[in-house]
Amino acid sequence: TVIESGAILMYLAEKSGQFMPTEMAARYEVIQWLMFQMGGIGPIFGQVHHFKRAAKEQVPYAINRYYTECRRLYGVLNTRLEGREYLAGDVSIADFAALPWVFRHDWQEVDLGDFPNVNRWYDTLMARPALTRGMDIPA
């Protein structure tokens, strides 16, 4: 049994031979951006979702702190995607891990127009029929 989404994505990529390069430098570039999602995007965007949408009490400090960090992470993604189609070479599990969080940019009250490279990347991924079908599955 494999648990944790990042480990599951790595397992599936290894098993299928898809979406993870075999060349070491390219492989670790994908892993680096997968870990960026696991350690940064997921936790921070999740806190934005909680404090903006689910918390019974509005806590301005928490909302501001996580929203500010969320926008900073969008900036990191935007810089990374400048002149690149995907986060790490070809489309990879790093993109698949980050996409669901960006898909909920409306929950974060983030306008993708503020991050044109992220917006382009998002549109490119959402043009893939398999990803669109996956994002249509209720969580």
Protein language model regions, located:
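GST-like domain detector, emphasizing the conserved glutathione-binding G-site
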Residues: 1-71, 78, 83, 87
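Residue-level signal for nonpolar/aromatic packing positions in well-ordered secondary structure
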Residues: 8, 77, 95, 125-128
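Generic structural signal for individual residues within well-ordered alpha-helical segments
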Residues: 28-31, 97, 119, 132
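Long hydrophobic alpha-helical segments typical of transmembrane helices together
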Residues: 118-139
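GST superfamily/GST-like fold recognition
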Residues: 40, 45-49, 86-113, 119, ...
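Active-site-flanking alpha-helical
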Residues: 13, 101-102, 135
